[in-house]
Amino acid sequence: QLYENKSRRPYIL
């Protein structure tokens, strides 16, 4: 998975 959800904030791993 390229995008991971954290605190409703999408960021690229």
Curated annotation (Swiss-Prot):
The modification Pyrrolidone carboxylic acid is found at Q1. It comes from the Eukaryota. One of its GO terms (cellular component) is extracellular region. The keyword Transferase does not apply. Its main location: secreted. Keywords: Pyrrolidone carboxylic acid, Secreted, Vasoactive. The record marks P10, Y11, I12 as: Cleavage. GO terms for biological process: blood vessel diameter maintenance. Transmembrane segments: none annotated. It is found in: Secreted. Smooth muscle-contracting peptide. Interacts with NTSR1. Interacts with SORT1. Interacts with SORL1. Belongs to the neurotensin family. This is Neurotensin. It comes from Cavia porcellus (Guinea pig).
